[in-house]
């Protein structure tokens, strides 16, 4: 059984600065980290490996220069995957979900897999599209919002997903793609032994040409800015007469 778990490198939100003059965001001092939602996907894949015993877990990512960071690669591998595959090119820096999914699908097809696990969304965009788009690109079953994996055999996967007023139990044939929610597990913190052992695990670096892609259209970000801050207003209406009540109602209407 070969399981691929996909992840994305995103800027650490704690290090993103805001320019007070125009509200633009400064990412220059922000280190990259694994998207928080993808930590659940990595943990889910590694838990399946422990249950099955003979499974192989491959971490996979598509992106730009952030994927060249040795510390970031070590962080991923210290969380349990046996191997790492990264597809690196400048055109993936600002790729749309559809283009990211196209590249992941091509890389997964080249690597081979039985099950592909994604996070619910990325910490930066949270488009919640990539997992389903990968399934569409590969023409295989895809389920999002998975909150529990009930069973996995050589041919079938059974999962639960929680909807607003019900819990679905779904069985799909393999190969398949699932996107897991944050309810599925609590990602573990890597031990010192795992961190040291991560340096010995294999890393494959591919280009778009290696997976059969010539170019992927990317959008151009004209500006990224924080919303303007509004001062909190405090309106005090004294009295309980009809005029005061009318004024109170009028102020409520303004904020509803």
Swiss-Prot record:
PROSITE patterns per the UniProt record, alphabetical: ETF_BETA
NCBIfam families: PRK03359.1
SUPFAM superfamilies membership: Adenine nucleotide alpha hydrolases-like (SSF52402)
Pathway in which this enzyme or protein is active: Amine and polyamine metabolism; carnitine metabolism
Pfam families: ETF
GO BP: any one term: carnitine metabolic process
Listed name of the protein: Protein FixA
Key words of the record: Electron transport, Transport
GO MF term list: electron transfer activity
UniProt signal peptide: none
Claim: Transcription is one of the keywords in the record: no
Subunit structure: Heterodimer of FixA and FixB.
Function: Required for anaerobic carnitine reduction. May bring reductant to CaiA.
